[in-house]
C-alpha cells in the first residue's frame, strides 16, 4: 500500500505517527502498535 493511500482528500490521516521517528506510521496489531523503523511499541 502506498503512503499516500493513508491520507484522505483533505490531507488528514487517522493513523498514529511514531513519537521517536516522527515521519513513520505505527503498524496496528491486535494488542499493540509498532514502528517498523525504530521498533517503538505501544501496548494496548
From Swiss-Prot:
InterPro entries found in the cross-reference section: Ribosomal_eS31, Ribosomal_eS31_arc, Ribosomal_zn-bd
Residues engaged in binding Zn(2+): 18, 21, 35, 38
SMART domains attached to this UniProt entry: Ribosomal_S27 (SM01402)
A molecular function GO annotation: structural constituent of ribosome
UniProt keyword terms in alphabetical order: Metal-binding, Ribonucleoprotein, Ribosomal protein, Zinc, Zinc-finger
GO biological process: translation
Cofactor detail note: Binds 1 zinc ion per subunit.
Pfam families associated with the record: Ribosomal_S27 (PF01599)
Chain ranges of zinc fingers (C4-type): 18-38
One GO location term (cellular component): ribosome
Cofactor: Zn(2+)
Subunit structure: Part of the 30S ribosomal subunit.
Family: Belongs to the eukaryotic ribosomal protein eS31 family.
Protein name: Small ribosomal subunit protein eS31
Gene behind the chain: rps27ae
Amino acid at each position: 500500500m502506498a503512503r499516500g493511500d493513508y491520507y484522505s482528500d483533505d490531507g488528514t490521516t487517522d493513523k498514529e505517527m511514531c513519537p521517536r521517528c516522527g515521519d513513520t506510521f505505527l503498524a496496528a496489531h491486535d494488542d499493540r502498535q509498532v514502528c517498523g523503523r525504530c521498533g517503538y511499541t505501544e501496548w494496548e
